[in-house]
Amino acid sequence: MRKQTFKVRLLSLIALCGIVMAFASCSNEDVAQSTVDTNTENNSNLTSFVTGAAATRTSLNYDDGAFFWEAGDHIYVKDDNGTWNKSSNAPTEKTASFKFMVPGKYTNSTTYKVYYPGKNGLNNNVTISAAQSQAQPNSTTHIGEVGDCGTADATGGNGVFNFRLDHQAAILVFQPFTNNTGIKNCQLTKIEVTSDNDITGTYTLDTTTGELTGSASGKSITMTTKGSGSYANGFPLTNSAADLATNGAYVVIRPGTHALTVRYWIKDYATNVEGAITKTYPAFDYEKNDYYDMTANINVTDYDGRQYYQWDAQNNFWNGHEWDSADPWQPV
């Protein structure tokens, strides 16, 4: 297992948060997601939270650490009246920067907490899904839908606030490989991750620390690795070494110390035979804002009908009557 850090390089998202009121028009980055017109002077009730740095993103490119805002991403901010406000717009496509328009009044403080609860979150409530899915290898566009989240303290003054968004979940990056010819003919259909404690459920982003709090009961996550076209039956297992492009899969979990059992479900569609290969990992501290390489050599031992002997026997137990012989007695 190899730990990779999101800090600064990856998931510490730097953003410029400019508080601009009625006379600030939006740039071409603005993409309205509601009936609010974000390009007129009628927006006196909106504040602009502008993501300025190229590192301000929410989906992951593993190789170079590049992140991007994805379609449907929203941020939440609590205003001077203590009211939760969701950005009235969101990107409609993958983008490196974006200007979020947020309702509410933000003039009483030089610090405001910014929340990204994921695409399916609300305010500071986050759900890490027990059922996760990825449509193609080495894709992270799904992580915001299954529990990726983050918080930041926006600080500044005179209408300009800067913040660095820290992601509060941990991500497991599964990279199975095999040298077994039979397994190379199979497809990876799903990955089951089971913990000795909770790794999935509904949590709260603490309004002081920004970290995930609360106790959920979910101890198992199933990642389905199927999409369309060449991935309709699952991800290939043709690689003899770890290779993200072939079958890399990203699973979001609650950070913490977990002992994990991982079951790789594979299927040979030619014979319609399927099964699971199990790997265990001792207790380890999976920290927030980090991702972890979970490489695994998945293999099976092939016992043919001639490998069963009684003590000190000269011939195998089913000699002449193996399951694959002309006169089989051996059960299968």
Model-found features: residue ranges?
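Sec-type signal peptide cleavage vicinity
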Residues: R2-V332
